[in-house]
Protein backbone atom coordinates (compact mmCIF):
# COMPACT_ATOMS: atom_id res chain seq x y z
CA UNK A 1 0.00 0.00 0.00
CA UNK A 2 1.31 3.42 -0.98
CA UNK A 3 -0.36 5.24 1.89
CA UNK A 4 -0.83 5.20 5.64
CA UNK A 5 -4.18 4.12 7.06
CA UNK A 6 -5.12 5.07 10.59
CA UNK A 7 -8.30 5.27 12.65
CA UNK A 8 -10.65 7.45 10.58
CA UNK A 9 -8.03 8.77 8.17
CA UNK A 10 -5.91 7.82 5.17
CA UNK A 11 -2.71 9.71 4.31
CA UNK A 12 -1.44 9.30 0.70
CA UNK A 13 2.13 8.74 1.90
CA UNK A 14 3.97 5.65 3.15
CA UNK A 15 5.15 6.13 6.72
CA UNK A 16 8.65 4.74 6.14
CA UNK A 17 10.31 7.74 7.75
CA UNK A 18 7.88 8.01 10.64
CA UNK A 19 6.80 11.56 9.79
CA UNK A 20 3.15 10.76 9.01
CA UNK A 21 0.84 12.05 11.72
CA UNK A 22 -2.91 12.10 12.34
CA UNK A 23 -4.60 14.87 10.30
CA UNK A 24 -6.77 15.61 13.34
CA UNK A 25 -3.82 16.44 15.58
CA UNK A 26 -0.79 17.65 13.60
CA UNK A 27 -0.10 20.01 10.66
CA UNK A 28 0.32 18.12 7.40
CA UNK A 29 3.07 20.30 5.93
CA UNK A 30 5.11 17.21 5.08
CA UNK A 31 2.56 16.44 2.33
CA UNK A 32 2.90 19.69 0.37
CA UNK A 33 4.57 23.07 0.73
CA UNK A 34 2.89 25.20 3.44
CA UNK A 35 2.22 27.82 0.76
CA UNK A 36 -0.28 25.38 -0.81
CA UNK A 37 -2.42 25.60 2.33
CA UNK A 38 -2.36 29.39 2.11
CA UNK A 39 -3.47 29.18 -1.54
CA UNK A 40 -6.24 26.77 -0.57
CA UNK A 41 -7.43 29.14 2.16
CA UNK A 42 -7.39 32.09 -0.26
CA UNK A 43 -9.39 30.09 -2.81
CA UNK A 44 -11.98 29.19 -0.18
CA UNK A 45 -12.18 32.86 0.84
CA UNK A 46 -12.81 33.78 -2.80
CA UNK A 47 -15.62 31.21 -3.11
CA UNK A 48 -17.18 32.54 0.10
CA UNK A 49 -17.12 36.24 -0.82
CA UNK A 50 -18.51 35.49 -4.29
CA UNK A 51 -20.76 32.49 -3.64
CA UNK A 52 -22.56 33.79 -0.55
CA UNK A 53 -23.69 37.18 -1.96
CA UNK A 54 -24.76 35.75 -5.33
CA UNK A 55 -26.81 32.93 -3.82
CA UNK A 56 -28.21 35.08 -1.01
CA UNK A 57 -29.20 37.71 -3.57
CA UNK A 58 -30.97 34.99 -5.55
CA UNK A 59 -33.11 34.13 -2.53
CA UNK A 60 -33.74 37.74 -1.55
CA UNK A 61 -34.67 38.97 -5.04
CA UNK A 62 -37.07 36.07 -5.59
CA UNK A 63 -38.82 36.71 -2.29
CA UNK A 64 -38.88 40.46 -2.98
CA UNK A 65 -40.50 40.20 -6.43
CA UNK A 66 -43.79 38.31 -6.54
CA UNK A 67 -43.61 37.70 -10.30
CA UNK A 68 -40.51 35.55 -9.75
CA UNK A 69 -42.32 33.13 -7.43
CA UNK A 70 -43.15 30.68 -10.20
CA UNK A 71 -43.07 26.87 -9.91
CA UNK A 72 -39.90 26.64 -11.99
CA UNK A 73 -38.15 29.13 -9.73
CA UNK A 74 -38.80 26.86 -6.75
CA UNK A 75 -36.14 24.57 -8.20
CA UNK A 76 -33.82 27.49 -8.89
CA UNK A 77 -34.25 28.64 -5.30
CA UNK A 78 -33.44 25.12 -4.19
CA UNK A 79 -30.16 25.42 -6.10
CA UNK A 80 -29.35 28.62 -4.22
CA UNK A 81 -30.12 26.97 -0.88
CA UNK A 82 -27.89 24.02 -1.79
CA UNK A 83 -25.05 26.36 -2.71
CA UNK A 84 -25.45 28.25 0.57
CA UNK A 85 -25.15 24.93 2.42
CA UNK A 86 -21.85 24.37 0.66
CA UNK A 87 -20.62 27.90 1.36
CA UNK A 88 -21.62 28.07 5.02
CA UNK A 89 -21.18 24.43 6.05
CA UNK A 90 -18.20 23.51 3.89
CA UNK A 91 -16.17 26.42 2.57
CA UNK A 92 -15.87 28.29 5.88
CA UNK A 93 -14.68 25.12 7.60
CA UNK A 94 -12.12 24.34 4.90
CA UNK A 95 -10.79 27.90 4.98
CA UNK A 96 -10.35 27.67 8.76
CA UNK A 97 -8.65 24.26 8.71
CA UNK A 98 -6.34 25.22 5.83
CA UNK A 99 -5.10 28.13 7.93
CA UNK A 100 -3.93 25.56 10.49
CA UNK A 101 -2.61 23.02 7.97
CA UNK A 102 -4.72 20.13 9.27
CA UNK A 103 -8.29 19.26 10.23
CA UNK A 104 -8.18 21.00 13.58
CA UNK A 105 -11.92 20.50 14.23
CA UNK A 106 -11.57 16.76 14.92
CA UNK A 107 -13.82 13.84 14.01
CA UNK A 108 -17.09 15.63 14.78
CA UNK A 109 -16.06 18.58 12.65
CA UNK A 110 -15.06 16.24 9.83
CA UNK A 111 -18.46 14.56 9.91
CA UNK A 112 -20.27 17.90 9.87
CA UNK A 113 -18.12 19.40 7.10
CA UNK A 114 -18.33 16.28 4.97
CA UNK A 115 -22.08 16.01 5.50
CA UNK A 116 -22.95 19.63 4.68
CA UNK A 117 -20.59 19.90 1.71
CA UNK A 118 -21.85 16.62 0.25
CA UNK A 119 -25.47 17.49 1.03
CA UNK A 120 -25.17 20.78 -0.83
CA UNK A 121 -23.56 19.06 -3.79
CA UNK A 122 -26.20 16.34 -3.96
CA UNK A 123 -29.12 18.77 -3.66
CA UNK A 124 -27.56 20.83 -6.42
CA UNK A 125 -26.99 17.80 -8.65
CA UNK A 126 -30.52 16.46 -8.27
CA UNK A 127 -31.95 19.96 -8.75
CA UNK A 128 -30.22 20.10 -12.12
CA UNK A 129 -31.79 16.75 -12.99
CA UNK A 130 -35.26 17.99 -11.98
CA UNK A 131 -34.70 21.14 -14.07
CA UNK A 132 -33.80 18.95 -17.04
CA UNK A 133 -37.00 16.94 -16.61
CA UNK A 134 -39.06 20.14 -16.36
CA UNK A 135 -37.54 21.56 -19.55
CA UNK A 136 -38.10 18.27 -21.39
CA UNK A 137 -41.74 17.99 -20.32
CA UNK A 138 -42.56 21.64 -21.08
CA UNK A 139 -40.76 21.90 -24.43
CA UNK A 140 -41.07 18.39 -25.88
CA UNK A 141 -44.56 17.71 -24.48
CA UNK A 142 -44.29 13.92 -24.03
CA UNK A 143 -47.46 14.24 -21.94
CA UNK A 144 -50.17 16.21 -23.75
CA UNK A 145 -51.84 19.10 -21.90
CA UNK A 146 -49.37 18.82 -19.02
CA UNK A 147 -48.57 22.01 -17.11
CA UNK A 148 -45.74 22.23 -14.61
CA UNK A 149 -47.44 23.61 -11.52
CA UNK A 150 -46.69 24.39 -7.90
CA UNK A 151 -47.38 20.84 -6.71
CA UNK A 152 -44.95 19.43 -9.27
CA UNK A 153 -42.30 21.92 -8.16
CA UNK A 154 -42.77 20.98 -4.50
CA UNK A 155 -42.50 17.30 -5.44
CA UNK A 156 -39.29 18.07 -7.35
CA UNK A 157 -37.77 19.93 -4.41
CA UNK A 158 -38.77 17.11 -2.04
CA UNK A 159 -37.15 14.59 -4.39
CA UNK A 160 -33.85 16.49 -4.38
CA UNK A 161 -33.75 16.58 -0.58
CA UNK A 162 -34.79 12.95 -0.24
CA UNK A 163 -32.12 11.73 -2.64
CA UNK A 164 -29.47 14.00 -1.11
CA UNK A 165 -30.18 12.73 2.41
CA UNK A 166 -30.18 9.14 1.12
CA UNK A 167 -26.59 9.74 0.04
CA UNK A 168 -25.24 11.84 2.93
CA UNK A 169 -26.81 10.29 6.05
CA UNK A 170 -25.50 6.68 5.71
CA UNK A 171 -21.82 7.65 6.33
CA UNK A 172 -22.93 9.23 9.62
CA UNK A 173 -24.49 5.98 10.82
CA UNK A 174 -21.87 3.44 9.79
CA UNK A 175 -22.36 2.72 6.09
CA UNK A 176 -19.05 4.17 4.88
CA UNK A 177 -17.66 7.26 6.66
CA UNK A 178 -16.35 10.78 6.17
CA UNK A 179 -12.57 11.17 6.39
CA UNK A 180 -10.08 13.95 5.55
CA UNK A 181 -9.00 13.86 1.90
CA UNK A 182 -6.42 15.45 -0.35
CA UNK A 183 -4.39 17.90 1.72
CA UNK A 184 -6.36 16.71 4.78
CA UNK A 185 -8.19 20.02 5.28
CA UNK A 186 -11.60 18.97 4.00
CA UNK A 187 -13.62 15.79 4.39
CA UNK A 188 -15.42 13.52 1.97
CA UNK A 189 -16.61 9.96 1.46
CA UNK A 190 -14.01 7.25 2.12
CA UNK A 191 -13.05 6.05 -1.37
CA UNK A 192 -9.59 5.15 -0.14
CA UNK A 193 -9.88 2.15 2.18
CA UNK A 194 -11.73 -1.07 2.79
CA UNK A 195 -11.93 -0.38 6.51
CA UNK A 196 -13.51 -3.29 8.34
CA UNK A 197 -17.07 -2.74 9.48
CA UNK A 198 -17.89 0.22 7.21
CA UNK A 199 -18.77 -1.55 3.92
CA UNK A 200 -17.17 1.23 1.88
CA UNK A 201 -17.27 -0.83 -1.32
CA UNK A 202 -21.05 -1.29 -1.39
CA UNK A 203 -21.71 2.33 -0.45
CA UNK A 204 -19.44 3.78 -3.15
CA UNK A 205 -21.07 1.55 -5.79
CA UNK A 206 -24.51 2.62 -4.58
CA UNK A 207 -23.52 6.30 -4.58
CA UNK A 208 -21.98 6.25 -8.06
CA UNK A 209 -24.94 4.46 -9.61
CA UNK A 210 -27.84 6.16 -7.83
CA UNK A 211 -26.39 9.61 -7.22
CA UNK A 212 -24.14 10.22 -10.21
CA UNK A 213 -24.91 7.93 -13.15
CA UNK A 214 -28.69 8.30 -12.89
CA UNK A 215 -28.84 12.13 -12.69
CA UNK A 216 -26.18 12.39 -15.42
CA UNK A 217 -28.24 10.12 -17.68
CA UNK A 218 -31.38 12.15 -16.97
CA UNK A 219 -29.63 15.42 -17.83
CA UNK A 220 -28.19 14.15 -21.11
CA UNK A 221 -31.42 12.43 -22.17
CA UNK A 222 -33.66 15.42 -21.44
CA UNK A 223 -31.41 18.04 -22.99
CA UNK A 224 -30.74 15.78 -25.97
CA UNK A 225 -34.47 15.50 -26.60
CA UNK A 226 -34.83 19.24 -26.04
CA UNK A 227 -32.33 20.02 -28.79
CA UNK A 228 -34.06 17.61 -31.16
CA UNK A 229 -37.44 19.21 -30.42
CA UNK A 230 -36.15 22.71 -31.14
CA UNK A 231 -34.54 21.59 -34.41
CA UNK A 232 -37.71 19.80 -35.53
CA UNK A 233 -39.79 22.85 -34.65
CA UNK A 234 -37.46 25.06 -36.67
CA UNK A 235 -37.72 22.73 -39.67
CA UNK A 236 -41.52 22.63 -39.44
CA UNK A 237 -41.63 26.43 -39.52
CA UNK A 238 -39.27 26.53 -42.50
CA UNK A 239 -36.51 27.96 -40.36
CA UNK A 240 -37.88 31.46 -39.91
CA UNK A 241 -35.54 34.08 -38.51
CA UNK A 242 -37.44 34.13 -35.23
CA UNK A 243 -37.18 30.37 -34.75
CA UNK A 244 -33.52 30.28 -35.72
CA UNK A 245 -32.77 32.93 -33.12
CA UNK A 246 -34.73 30.99 -30.48
CA UNK A 247 -32.94 27.77 -31.47
CA UNK A 248 -29.55 29.41 -31.04
CA UNK A 249 -30.53 30.74 -27.61
CA UNK A 250 -31.79 27.39 -26.35
CA UNK A 251 -28.78 25.57 -27.84
CA UNK A 252 -26.37 27.97 -26.15
CA UNK A 253 -28.12 27.58 -22.81
CA UNK A 254 -28.08 23.78 -23.04
CA UNK A 255 -24.40 23.67 -23.99
CA UNK A 256 -23.48 25.95 -21.08
CA UNK A 257 -25.57 23.87 -18.67
CA UNK A 258 -23.96 20.59 -19.72
CA UNK A 259 -20.43 22.03 -19.77
CA UNK A 260 -20.96 23.59 -16.34
CA UNK A 261 -22.13 20.26 -14.96
CA UNK A 262 -19.21 18.34 -16.44
CA UNK A 263 -16.58 20.88 -15.36
CA UNK A 264 -17.89 20.81 -11.81
CA UNK A 265 -18.50 17.13 -11.23
CA UNK A 266 -16.89 14.87 -13.80
CA UNK A 267 -13.23 15.43 -12.72
CA UNK A 268 -14.08 14.77 -9.06
CA UNK A 269 -16.18 11.71 -9.83
CA UNK A 270 -13.54 10.31 -12.21
CA UNK A 271 -10.70 10.71 -9.71
CA UNK A 272 -12.81 9.29 -6.88
CA UNK A 273 -13.70 6.27 -9.01
CA UNK A 274 -10.05 5.77 -9.97
CA UNK A 275 -8.97 5.88 -6.33
CA UNK A 276 -11.74 3.47 -5.38
CA UNK A 277 -10.84 0.96 -8.11
CA UNK A 278 -7.07 1.33 -7.53
CA UNK A 279 -6.92 1.33 -3.75
CA UNK A 280 -3.32 1.12 -2.59
CA UNK A 281 -1.95 2.76 -5.75
CA UNK A 282 0.42 5.69 -5.43
CA UNK A 283 -1.03 9.19 -5.77
CA UNK A 284 -0.24 12.55 -4.23
CA UNK A 285 -2.41 14.76 -2.01
CA UNK A 286 -3.12 17.19 -4.86
CA UNK A 287 -4.54 14.36 -6.99
CA UNK A 288 -7.84 14.56 -5.10
CA UNK A 289 -7.60 18.14 -3.85
CA UNK A 290 -7.73 19.86 -7.25
CA UNK A 291 -10.85 18.09 -8.66
CA UNK A 292 -12.58 18.37 -5.27
CA UNK A 293 -12.35 22.13 -5.46
CA UNK A 294 -13.50 22.21 -9.07
CA UNK A 295 -16.68 20.57 -7.74
CA UNK A 296 -16.94 23.16 -4.95
CA UNK A 297 -16.82 25.96 -7.51
CA UNK A 298 -20.30 24.90 -8.65
CA UNK A 299 -21.62 27.25 -5.97
CA UNK A 300 -20.63 30.07 -8.33
CA UNK A 301 -21.43 28.37 -11.66
CA UNK A 302 -24.97 27.44 -10.69
CA UNK A 303 -26.39 30.93 -10.06
CA UNK A 304 -24.49 32.35 -13.03
CA UNK A 305 -25.84 29.76 -15.46
CA UNK A 306 -29.33 29.07 -14.13
CA UNK A 307 -30.23 32.44 -12.61
CA UNK A 308 -28.22 35.30 -14.07
CA UNK A 309 -28.97 34.21 -17.67
CA UNK A 310 -32.67 34.61 -16.90
CA UNK A 311 -33.56 38.07 -18.27
CA UNK A 312 -36.56 38.55 -15.98
CA UNK A 313 -34.53 37.71 -12.89
CA UNK A 314 -31.67 39.92 -14.02
CA UNK A 315 -34.08 42.85 -14.43
CA UNK A 316 -35.49 42.28 -10.93
CA UNK A 317 -32.01 41.93 -9.43
CA UNK A 318 -30.84 45.21 -10.97
CA UNK A 319 -34.03 46.93 -9.80
CA UNK A 320 -33.39 45.68 -6.26
CA UNK A 321 -29.73 46.73 -6.26
CA UNK A 322 -30.59 50.22 -7.54
CA UNK A 323 -33.40 50.78 -5.00
CA UNK A 324 -36.35 50.28 -7.33
CA UNK A 325 -34.88 51.71 -10.54
CA UNK A 326 -33.25 49.96 -13.48
CA UNK A 327 -30.68 52.23 -15.18
CA UNK A 328 -30.42 49.69 -18.02
CA UNK A 329 -34.15 49.66 -18.76
CA UNK A 330 -33.71 50.32 -22.48
CA UNK A 331 -31.24 47.47 -22.94
CA UNK A 332 -33.47 45.04 -21.07
CA UNK A 333 -36.48 45.99 -23.21
CA UNK A 334 -34.42 45.58 -26.36
CA UNK A 335 -33.52 42.05 -25.33
CA UNK A 336 -37.03 41.06 -24.28
CA UNK A 337 -38.00 40.00 -27.81
CA UNK A 338 -35.57 37.09 -27.63
CA UNK A 339 -37.39 35.78 -24.58
CA UNK A 340 -40.69 35.87 -26.47
CA UNK A 341 -39.15 34.09 -29.44
CA UNK A 342 -37.76 31.33 -27.24
CA UNK A 343 -41.17 30.90 -25.63
CA UNK A 344 -42.87 30.56 -29.01
CA UNK A 345 -40.39 27.92 -30.10
CA UNK A 346 -40.92 26.05 -26.84
CA UNK A 347 -44.64 25.89 -27.46
CA UNK A 348 -44.20 23.82 -30.63
CA UNK A 349 -44.28 20.09 -30.07
CA UNK A 350 -41.98 17.92 -32.17
CA UNK A 351 -43.37 16.33 -35.30
UniProtKB/Swiss-Prot annotation:
Changes after translation: Phosphorylated on some or all of the serine and threonine residues present in the C-terminal region. Contains one covalently linked retinal chromophore.
Positions of the record's site feature: Plays an important role in the conformation switch to the active conformation: 113
Topological domains annotated Cytoplasmic: 62-73, 134-152, 225-252, 309-351
Lipid moiety-binding region (S-palmitoyl cysteine): 323
All ranges on the Extracellular side of the membrane: 1-36, 97-110, 174-202, 275-286
Residue ranges annotated as motif 'Ionic lock' involved in activated form stabilization: 134-136
CDD domains noted in UniProt: 7tmA_MWS_opsin
Gene Ontology molecular functions: 11-cis retinal binding; G protein-coupled photoreceptor activity
Residue ranges, compositional bias (Low complexity): 335-351
Keywords from the named record: Cell projection, Chromophore, Disulfide bond, G-protein coupled receptor, Glycoprotein, Lipoprotein, Membrane, Palmitate, Phosphoprotein, Photoreceptor protein, Receptor, Retinal protein, Sensory transduction, Transducer, Transmembrane, Transmembrane helix, Vision
Membrane topology qualifier: Multi-pass membrane protein
Top-rank lineage group of the source organism: Eukaryota
GO cellular component: membrane; photoreceptor disc membrane; plasma membrane
GO biological process: absorption of visible light; G protein-coupled opsin signaling pathway; visual perception
Ranges annotated as spanning the membrane: 37-61, 74-96, 111-133, 153-173, 203-224, 253-274, 287-308
Record's keyword annotation contains Transcription regulation: no
Pfam families: 7tm_1 (PF00001), Rhodopsin_N (PF10413)
InterPro entries per record: GPCR_opsins (IPR050125), GPCR_Rhodpsn (IPR000276), GPCR_Rhodpsn_7TM (IPR017452), Opsin (IPR001760), Retinal_BS (IPR027430), Rhodopsin (IPR000732), Rhodopsin_N (IPR019477)
Region (Disordered): 330-351
Function statement: Photoreceptor required for image-forming vision at low light intensity. While most salt water fish species use retinal as chromophore, most freshwater fish use 3-dehydroretinal, or a mixture of retinal and 3-dehydroretinal. Light-induced isomerization of 11-cis to all-trans retinal triggers a conformational change that activates signaling via G-proteins. Subsequent receptor phosphorylation mediates displacement of the bound G-protein alpha subunit by arrestin and terminates signaling.
Protein name from the UniProt record: Rhodopsin
Gene: rho
Amino acid sequence: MNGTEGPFFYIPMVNTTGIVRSPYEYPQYYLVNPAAYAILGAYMFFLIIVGFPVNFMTLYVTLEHKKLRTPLNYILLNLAVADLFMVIGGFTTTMYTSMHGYFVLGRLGCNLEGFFATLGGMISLWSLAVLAIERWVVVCKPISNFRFGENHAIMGVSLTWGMALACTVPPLVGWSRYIPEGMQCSCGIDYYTRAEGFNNESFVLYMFFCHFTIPLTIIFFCYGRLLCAVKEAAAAQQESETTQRAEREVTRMVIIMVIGFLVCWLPYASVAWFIFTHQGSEFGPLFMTIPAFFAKSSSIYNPMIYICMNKQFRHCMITTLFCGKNPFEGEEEGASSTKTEASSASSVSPA
